[in-house]
Swiss-Prot record:
Name of the gene encoding the protein in the UniProt record: ndk
Keyword Repressor set for record: no
Protein family per UniProt: Belongs to the NDK family.
Keywords: ATP-binding, Cytoplasm, Kinase, Magnesium, Metal-binding, Nucleotide metabolism, Nucleotide-binding, Phosphoprotein, Transferase
Binding, ATP: 11, 59, 87, 93, 104, 114
InterPro entries hit by this protein: NDK-like_dom, NDK-like_dom_sf, Nucleoside_diP_kinase, Nucleoside_diP_kinase_AS
Organism: Cereibacter sphaeroides (strain ATCC 17025 / ATH 2.4.3)
Listed GO MF terms: ATP binding; metal ion binding; nucleoside diphosphate kinase activity
UniProt protein name: Nucleoside diphosphate kinase
Quaternary structure and partners: Homotetramer.
Primary enzyme class: transferase
Function: Major role in the synthesis of nucleoside triphosphates other than ATP. The ATP gamma phosphate is transferred to the NDP beta phosphate via a ping-pong mechanism, using a phosphorylated active-site intermediate.
Pfam families: NDK
HAMAP family tied to this protein: NDP_kinase
Domain of life: Bacteria
Length: 140
């Protein structure tokens, strides 16, 4: 399996509860390396641009307002099959359907406040990483 990079966002519900360290421990325990990380507070316009692919979905307004409500931690994870591994560690979008031991099962408050975001494909990962990080910020 190839070494990949993927974007991870620790969402406001998790940063508000100081869960960044616990969430990152789960990524690292799964063999993923954090090669870039920063804590930021998205503006509503930035959240709308980042989630623009969902602009016609009924949850778009609620999602973007939530993502701009408080700070988030954006980071790049690297490892073998990082995209799939990250999604496995995160668990199902709905925490009620997430497997035991996953981030969402353990920390999510609801489908909307589900603690983490992760890229779903190599193309998406590249776009999402470039949205938040320059090449100089990626330290492998």
């Amino acid at each position: 399996m190839a070494i990949e990079r993927t974007l991870s966002i620790i969402k406001p519900d998790a940063t508000r509860r100081n869960l960044t360290g616990k969430i990152n421990a789960k990524f690292e325990d799964a063999g993923l390396r954090i090669v870039a990380q920063k804590r930021i507070h998205l503006s509503l316009a930035q959240a709308q641009k980042f989630y623009g692919v969902h602009k016609d979905r009924p949850f778009f307004g609620e999602l973007t307002e939530f993502m701009a409500s408080e700070p988030v931690v954006v980071q790049v994870l690297e490892g073998e099959g990082a995209i799939a591994k990250n999604r496995e560690v995160m668990g199902a979008t709905n925490p009620a359907n997430a497997d035991e031991g996953t981030i969402r099962k353990e920390f999510a408050l609801s489908v909307g406040e589900n603690s983490v975001h992760g890229s779903d494909a190599p193309e998406t990962a590249a776009e999402e990483i470039a949205f938040f990080f320059s090449g100089l910020e990626l330290v492998g």
